[in-house]
């Protein structure tokens, strides 16, 4: 089954190359023209906040469709830390941190609205606190959903690493509050928790999965230190043909984004990116 294949800007833009967004967009434009990808997923980074006009204009000028935006990851960490502060009685500090998280979230939504992006991936929890106070994170979802909707956006909650519980259990807590949103399955995080098969055959969550992130993972069960460096398919332990079979079995017709990076101090490994996209294009 041929599914829409996108490439994350996060695979091409980072501190190591001075956040060279324009250079990355040139590569993505070439890949799109060659029909190697059908679009991009805009990975939000703090460096973009002061350059909103330049970033959005670069995306527009590229002509590459932008069906998905990835909310800045730190927002989930802030929500987790705010929950921990609330439960420890530090309500004033918690309120200030939560307000800052929502301020940044609204700014992310504004980026998406500028570009007409209809779906936003969100890390609902994160950082060291992670899902230790998951009820607080889940409790924030209705307001996040309402805020996103005001900008014409639907939220997709990701199966991010969970230090207290596990992503699948947390997703099941999310479901009653998901509204018109969806779920996004990350292969690397699924392997970290050894939940790839369990998640993709689960009758409650599988039908809500409408987007997939692809990268490989070389560590063991709950080996959080092995999450980086982010590997390309074939460099780690994930059985991607088996993953593709599970997606086929569940009748998955949604989109797939490659997240594995190809950037370095001396530029981009474009041939490697091309090989990975070709592999995924033939498999998925």
What feature does the model see in each segment?
Residues 1-107, 113, 149, 180-182, ...:
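N-terminal pre-domain/capping segments
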Residues 80-182, 192:
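Active-site acidic/histidine proton-transfer and metal-coordination neighborhood
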Residues 37-38, 65, 118, 210, ...:
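Short acidic/polar active-site loop segments enriched in Thr and Asp
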Residues 18-21, 25, 51-56, 131-142, ...:
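Distinct, well-ordered alpha-helical segments
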Residues 8-12, 43-45, 71-74, 125-127, ...:
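Active-site beta-loop-alpha junctions enriched in small/polar residues
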Residues 235-249:
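A short, acidic, amphipathic alpha-helical segment used as a generic capping/interface helix at domain edges
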Residues 263-284:
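Aromatic-rich peripheral "rim/lid" segments of glycoside hydrolase catalytic domains that contact
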Residues 39-40, 145-237:
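Acidic/histidine-rich catalytic cores of soluble enzymes
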């Amino acid at each position: 089954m041929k599914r829409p294949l996108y490439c994350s800007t996060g695979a091409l833009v980072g501190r190591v190359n001075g956040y060279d967004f324009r250079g990355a967009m040139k590569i993505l434009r070439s890949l799109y023209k060659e029909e190697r990808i059908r679009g991009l997923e805009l990975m939000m980074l703090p460096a973009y906040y002061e350059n909103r006009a330049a970033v959005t204009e670069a995306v527009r000028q590229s002509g590459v469709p932008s069906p998905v935006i990835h909310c800045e990851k730190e927002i989930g960490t802030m929500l987790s830390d705010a929950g921990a502060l609330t439960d420890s009685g530090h309500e004033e500090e918690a309120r200030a941190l939560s307000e800052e998280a929502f301020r940044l979230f609204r700014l992310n939504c504004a980026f998406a609205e500028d570009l007409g992006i209809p779906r936003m991936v969100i890390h609902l929890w994160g950082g060291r606190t992670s899902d230790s106070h998951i009820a607080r994170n889940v409790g924030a979802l209705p307001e996040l959903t309402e805020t996103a909707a005001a900008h014409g956006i639907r939220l997709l909650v990701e199966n991010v690493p969970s230090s207290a519980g596990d992503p699948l259990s947390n997703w099941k807590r999310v479901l009653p509050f998901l509204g018109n949103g969806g779920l996004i399955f990350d292969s690397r995080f699924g392997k970290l928790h050894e939940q790839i098969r369990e998640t993709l055959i689960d009758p409650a969550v599988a039908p809500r999965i409408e987007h997939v992130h692809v990268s490989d993972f070389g560590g063991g069960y709950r080996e959080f230190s092995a999450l980086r460096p982010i590997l390309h398919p074939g460099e780690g332990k994930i059985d991607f043909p088996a993953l593709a079979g599970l997606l086929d079995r569940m009748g998955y017709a949604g989109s797939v984004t490659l997240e594995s990076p190809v950037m370095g101090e001396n530029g981009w490994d474009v041939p490697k990116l091309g090989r990975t996209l070709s592999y995924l294009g033939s498999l998925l």
